[in-house]
């Protein structure tokens, strides 16, 4: 069974709803889940915020965070995931985010091609969030990297749900 089927099954059985906040993956995470029958019961909302203004305006990522750490950083990914959960109308209690670079900028500056930052955030019953983040590096063509990043983001949802924070209701 493909990971997206596993995630839909896991979220549905856990009674959880998911929000996505995507940059480099450009909606691939939400699209993978939406391809699974029954995903409407666990996929709440998906944001694609590619630009700094989109990350700030829709997800509440602070300009100072983007300037200090760069757009491809765990700090930005964390604020994206937490911002998705805080967005008006969002009823999700789990969010996954991705920001990264799929190909080289060519100037030798910034993170290497394939660098992807992720965050997974859980809204607790008391309103607080617990958030985990990682950085990974994938190889391949631009779209192979984006696909790998989307699959990786999905593959870690159940892992992080088992840690002490998300289990605390």
Regions found by a protein language model. Give the residues of each.
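Short alpha-helical segments enriched in small residues
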Residues: 1-169
């Amino acid at each position: 069974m493909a990971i997206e089927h596993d995630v839909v099954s896991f979220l549905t059985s856990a009674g959880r709803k998911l929000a996505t906040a995507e940059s480099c993956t450009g909606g691939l995470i939400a699209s993978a889940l939406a391809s699974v029958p029954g995903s409407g019961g666990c996929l709440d909302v998906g944001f694609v915020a590619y630009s700094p203004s989109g990350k700030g305006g829709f997800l509440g990522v602070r300009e100072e965070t983007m300037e200090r750490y760069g757009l491809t950083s765990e700090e930005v990914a964390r604020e994206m995931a937490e911002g998705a959960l805080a967005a008006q109308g969002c009823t999700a209690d789990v969010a996954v985010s991705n920001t990264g670079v799929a190909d080289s900028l060519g100037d030798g500056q910034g993170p290497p091609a394939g660098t992807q930052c992720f965050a997974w955030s859980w809204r607790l019953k008391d309103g607080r969030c617990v958030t985990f983040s990682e950085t990974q590096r994938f190889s391949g063509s631009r779209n192979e990297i984006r696909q790998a990043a989307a699959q990786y983001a999905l593959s870690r949802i159940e892992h992080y749900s088992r840690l002490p924070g998300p289990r605390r209701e």
